[in-house]
């Protein structure tokens, strides 16, 4: 679990997301409170429940990006889901309890990766011995044993230096579990995975011989040896505990399940989904293939654009379970400028790196960046406002000719205001063209 302070979390998010300080502060405090809760006395710890967050803001301003970056920072079980994928219990589709099942599966995967990383060195040593056994015939006498020992050291040195990577050897390794594809109706994924696990366990313990290059064999044997060193029962217990105590669920597009006054037809995936989410967010026990999971201390962060609805259109009970409200601001031309240059691996850096592979040197001048930002902002204002995502469209159209005409020769392209006007002038000013092309 992350031990970063709120200030450090915001500083890390600043590297990738421009502005939106209120939202960053809210998620940073919520993440830090997870750590703070684990430090208090156990009797009080169970009484401290997470304060769930509702992020409100137009599309393309950074709501989903905050979730993506938070997942990497949290170092805790984390899952991001779309509210629109769920239907209420009794209808075809996924029920909301599958969120918790996926969270637990993700937690087990996270802990398995951490454990495998810890015992990686021991696993590599064991894999090395198995490859040397395959490369060298067994000794038949004590004299041969001594000779084999020195030969083994020579081969070990060659193996570590990569001289034997392309040599093909025959090794005995664990048999691949039987692959059984089961087509099940939506909403029955849990039963499907249990059936697949049952068929997989039927082939466990069996081995097979395979011919592989030393490089591929070393990787497969390292993974196999690492898996042997892991205590699966202990790992599952720790992963379930982490999911219950430190798990974070990010529910995107929550506004799409609000009831609309002018909507006709059954609200299968709307109010019903909200009512199903209530016990999950309030705290209940969910049955999974790994056992019963309590959701009392899982942190829920919901987000939505609320273009066609308002947060007050959510059912009152759900509003009460999302006590912290954060409003994200619409992006200005200045924000677009910063998005193009400031974040790590910014859009301009990505395009420069891609074209550099073919000898094209791409340079962006300050007035060029400004003009790109203004163009994206103007198109957003005149057509649909899709926020920072508009920059992807504008940049792709701007550099289309440069990307198409590369032929391996060294070329220098300077993207200034004149270049932008030449490539995008007509598209940006003609509303019909910008609506369908940009």
Swiss-Prot record:
Keywords: ATP-binding, Chaperone, Cytoplasm, Nucleotide-binding, Stress response
Family: Belongs to the ClpX chaperone family. HslU subfamily.
Binding residues for ATP: 18, 60-65, 252, 317, 389
UniProt source species: Teredinibacter turnerae (strain ATCC 39867 / T7901)
HAMAP family named among the record's database cross-references: HslU (MF_00249)
GO biological process, one term: proteolysis involved in protein catabolic process
Major localisation: cytoplasm
Recorded GO CC terms: HslUV protease complex
Compartmental location: Cytoplasm
InterPro entries tied to this protein: AAA+_ATPase, ATP-dep_Clp_protease_ClpX, ATPase_AAA_core, Clp_ATPase_C, HslU, P-loop_NTPase
The protein's assembly and partners: A double ring-shaped homohexamer of HslV is capped on each side by a ring-shaped HslU homohexamer. The assembly of the HslU/HslV complex is dependent on binding of ATP.
Protein name: ATP-dependent protease ATPase subunit HslU
Stated role: ATPase subunit of a proteasome-like degradation complex; this subunit has chaperone activity. The binding of ATP and its subsequent hydrolysis by HslU are essential for unfolding of protein substrates subsequently hydrolyzed by HslV. HslU recognizes the N-terminal part of its protein substrates and unfolds these before they are guided to HslV for hydrolysis.
Keyword set includes Ligase: no
Keyword Hydrolase: no
Superkingdom as given in the UniProt entry: Bacteria
Gene name of this polypeptide: hslU
MF GO annotations: ATP binding; ATP hydrolysis activity; peptidase activity; proteasome-activating activity
